Amino acid sequence: METQPRLLLVHGSVVNADLTWSAQKPLAERFEIVAPNRRGFPPGPDVEHVDFEDEALWLEQFLEPGTHVAGHSYGGVCSLFLAARRPELLRSLTVIEPPAFGVARGIPAADEFMSRIEEHWTNGPRDPAEFLRGFLVLVGSSTPSGDFTPELLQGARTLMVERPPSEAVIPFDELARAPFPKLVVSGGHSAAFDAVCGVLEERLGAERAVLPGAGHSVQRLGEPFNELLASFVERAEEP
């Protein structure tokens, strides 16, 4: 039986792998899907601190030669560092709205967004539920009605101890030299995220796609995103 291409899916903030990638389940017919729950997310325990560079180290255990990596949001920042650390193991890299706003510093939309995020982290509510509501509005994610589940509240607590992704010094030189193809995806809902994705496209020599309709969580579109990702991965598999 022919081996399926290996696809490592790296989730972002607030929700775990199961919730982040629920619309990608059909891809299991075409790929070997590996979607770990990062530390601090259900069903695991709370953590005291999250750092995207440390997460990249932790994610190395899921790499095998020829792995395709796709990361959403904070997981996209982690994936950029992972790919730079172990380029010899990657066959392709896809990032979906990584909040590496530092790369777009000087672009007004990104600067304004960073200011609002920093204000929320510094002076926003300390109650996890209220902190999460404010965060979801800022990034353009949907806000559940009613009370948050215990799982979402744990995700909120983890969010509050994340190292700000705007601090990320993306290893552009290493990534640009890496021979595998790159894809940068955004949801067409935010000038700030578009600014980041535009810089990544240029500096990485990446392909670029915009899929509107699901805000920040582009993968929740399901089939349109799945076909984009599958086509990109299958092209990367070609000799």
Q: PLM features: residue spans?
A:
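Conserved HGGG/HGGXW glycine-rich cap/lid loop of the alpha/beta-hydrolase fold
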Residues: 1-45
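Active-site loop/oxyanion-hole signature of alpha/beta-hydrolase fold enzymes
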Residues: 32-68
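Short beta-strand immediately N-terminal to the catalytic nucleophile in serine-hydrolase-like folds
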Residues: 69-71, 96
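Gly/Ala-rich beta-loop-alpha elbow adjacent to hydrolase catalytic centers
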Residues: 71-75, 79
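Flexible "cap/lid" loop of the alpha/beta hydrolase fold
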Residues: 84-122
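Conserved alpha/beta-hydrolase catalytic His-Asp/Glu region
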Residues: 125-160
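Conserved serine/cysteine hydrolase catalytic core
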Residues: 148-213
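Catalytic active-site module of serine/aspartate enzymes centered on a nucleophile-bearing elbow/loop
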Residues: 204-239
